[in-house]
C-alpha cells in the first residue's frame, strides 16, 4: 500500500472515528476546511467537510488495514496481506519510553499454521493501534492459542539491571534473548525468531541470542510489529505494562501517567513532594533525564 489512502466517510462516523483516535493518543486539531485531523508519530488522518478522509504517513498500511477498514469503514478492499504460516517466535517490548512503570518484554511461540491463522482471524495488530480497554481480551485470546512468556522488570529491578548493563539496548537484548531461549524448542529445527531491530546494529541482539542458543535463526527488521506473531507479543507486553502500572498505583496510592511528557514530569514532582525520593525511585526509571531534573527542582 502507498503511504497515503483516500476514501469517503459517512458523517455518522465522524464522531466515532474522532473518539477512537483520541483513545489511541492521536493529537486532534481542526485545520481549515476539515472536520478534524488526528496525528500520531507515524500517521495523520484528516476528515474533510465533504466527507473525504485522507490518511498519510509511514504507518498508513497498518492504520488502514488493522483499524480504519475493519473497525470504522467496515470494508476490507485494500487488505492483501499474504498470511505467513511458518512456525515462529515473535518478541516485543512495552514501557521502554515511559518514565513511570516497568519494562515488559513478551514472546509468543506460534507453533502451528492453525494457531497463526487464528491470530489473523482475531485481527491481531500492533498494540499501539489498539485501545487499552481491548488489550486484555486480545491477550487472553493469544494465550489460548500460543505458548507465551513475559518478563516484567519493575522499576526497582530495572534500575539495578540498567546500572549493570549501562545501556538500554543491551538490557533489551538480554530480555529478548531470554524470552527466545525459553520459548524455542530443542532443537529449534525450522522454528525462527523475529524481533524489531531496536539497536543501530543487528549484532547487539544477535550476540545476546547466540550466548544462549546457536541453533535458532533470528530475523530483525524495522517495524517488525507488522508480523502477526510479533504483534501478538506486543499486545502481551502492553497488557503486562498496564497491569503493572495499576499494581504500582495501588501499592503506593499514587496516580502514574504514561509517556515522558511535561505532565509526567509534573506528576513526578508531586510524588517526590508527597511521598519522597524512595517511593519515586520505586515507580520510575532513574536513568531518564527527567529523574535528575525532578530531583534538582526539589532541592531548590
Swiss-Prot record:
PROSITE patterns: RNASE_H_2
Entry's EC annotation: 3.1.26.4
Pfam families: DUF3378, RNase_HII
Keyword Cytoplasm attributed: yes
UniProt-listed InterPro entries: RNase_HII/HIII, RNase_HII/HIII_dom, RNase_HIII, RNase_HIII_N, RNaseH-like_sf, RNaseH_sf, TBP_dom_sf
Main location group: cytoplasm
Protein name per UniProt: Ribonuclease HIII
Family: Belongs to the RNase HII family. RnhC subfamily.
PANTHER family, alphabetized: RIBONUCLEASE, RIBONUCLEASE H2 SUBUNIT A
Record bears the keyword Magnesium: yes
Domain RNase H type-2: 86-300
GO annotation (BP), single: mismatch repair
Residues that hold a divalent metal cation according to the record: 92-93, 196
Catalytic activity of the protein: Endonucleolytic cleavage to 5'-phosphomonoester
Cofactor section: Mn(2+); Mg(2+)
Keyword annotations from UniProtKB, A to Z: Cytoplasm, Endonuclease, Hydrolase, Magnesium, Metal-binding, Nuclease
Protein function: Endonuclease that specifically degrades the RNA of RNA-DNA hybrids.
Cofactor note: Manganese or magnesium. Binds 1 divalent metal ion per monomer in the absence of substrate. May bind a second metal ion after substrate binding.
Compartments where found: Cytoplasm
